[in-house]
């Protein structure tokens, strides 16, 4: 069987990969084999970290809400606050509550005081 060099098709594939890795440092942006390895690794990391990002933001929102609620009332905590929210059927998600906690604490205090009653 004769050898096929692939010609312009291989060149087109390599340039496409090189464009992806153009911002990488050193050999990771120059050598085809290391570029392909780094591309696989970069895409795997991006996929993994998209899931982590959702987790981290949720943790941040919970920490912010908890800090503001505890500063208002020492006996009251985040878990009780969320439990009472669900009992009263107030559907506010954690992202919105965290923004209210940062931008307008008094509003969150009013919400928590209404729920406690």
UniProtKB/Swiss-Prot annotation:
Membrane-spanning residues: none
BP-aspect Gene Ontology terms: ribosomal large subunit assembly; translation
Major subcellular site: plastid
Cysteine disulfide links: none
Compartmental location: Plastid, Chloroplast
Record's keyword terms, sorted: Chloroplast, Plastid, Ribonucleoprotein, Ribosomal protein, RNA-binding, rRNA-binding
Superkingdom in the source lineage: Eukaryota
GO molecular function: rRNA binding; structural constituent of ribosome
One cellular component (GO) term of this entry: ribosome
InterPro entries: Ribosomal_bL20, RIBOSOMAL_L20_CS, Ribosomal_protein_bL20_C
Protein family according to the UniProt entry: Belongs to the bacterial ribosomal protein bL20 family.
NCBIfam families per the UniProt record, alphabetical: rplT_bact
Task of the protein: Binds directly to 23S ribosomal RNA and is necessary for the in vitro assembly process of the 50S ribosomal subunit. It is not involved in the protein synthesizing functions of that subunit.
The protein's name in its UniProt record: Large ribosomal subunit protein bL20c
């Amino acid at each position: 069987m004769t050898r096929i060099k692939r010609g312009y098709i291989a060149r087109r594939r390599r340039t496409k990969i090189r464009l992806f890795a153009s911002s990488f440092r050193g050999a990771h942006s120059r050598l085809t084999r290391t570029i392909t390895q780094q591309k696989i690794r970069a895409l795997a990391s991006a996929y993994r970290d998209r899931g982590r990002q959702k987790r981290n933001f949720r943790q941040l929102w919970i920490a912010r809400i908890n800090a503001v609620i505890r500063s208002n009332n020492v006996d009251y905590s985040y878990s009780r606050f969320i439990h009472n929210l669900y009992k009263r059927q107030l559907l506010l998600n954690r992202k919105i509550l965290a923004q209210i906690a940062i931008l307008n604490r008094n509003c969150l205090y009013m919400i928590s005081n209404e729920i406690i009653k």
